[in-house]
């Protein structure tokens, strides 16, 4: 995992001061190595926008992921704990209690998520929320399974759109995504079925006919959330991409 932080202006267009706390956008990417960006010396793939951000800001040369795999690495980021102390130790899958584990039979799916974060320990979005921030997260959660004690709606997130389950996040044309939106009146995390995708099977040659590409949909939801933010209140956003 690699992360970047973007601090935005604290002045309005007419020069009047708004909130004094910086807006923060933190980006996490699965499977992006230290040497995959131009600003860290990668010579073959062009990353001009990220390189510009690095040139205008700061590069971290001794920042390390908490673990080589997804869920425990994210847990270290969220909890601030060393992976040796964190309760999440691997990408353990939790499934619904059904006789046969199914995924991909159109609307029959049983994936629900990973081991939940310990509710006795505060996590980063909760800290930001307690300090007056509006919070949003878009992409992979992997910090609890559906219905567990640790889903975005219970852990300081105001707006969420993406994958609760880290395994499902590697299926780019899924049967469903997860959503939590106070603005839409959600009282908990819900499933949003991809109506166009489920017309085609999850496996085989017809899979390529599925039109709803999750990365684009998640990215668009994040942009919409950013556009909706109030100048008078700081925001903290987490974007988690699966490359």
Language-model regions: role of each:
Residues 43-75, 80-85, 132-136, 155-164:
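Short, structured active-site-proximal loop/turn typified by the sulfatase FGly-forming signature C/S-X-P-X-R
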Residues 38-39, 88-90:
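Conserved catalytic-core motifs of eukaryotic protein kinase domains, centered on the activation segment
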Residues 1-19:
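Bacterial Sec-dependent N-terminal signal peptides
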Residues 39-40, 64, 113-114:
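A generic secondary-structure micro-motif detector
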Residues 90-133, 141-237, 241-243:
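Formylglycine-dependent
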Residues 31-34, 59, 66-71, 83-84, ...:
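Solvent-exposed loop/turn segments at secondary-structure junctions
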Residues 17-58, 141:
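Active-site-proximal N-terminal segment of extracellular/periplasmic enzymes that hydrolyze or transfer
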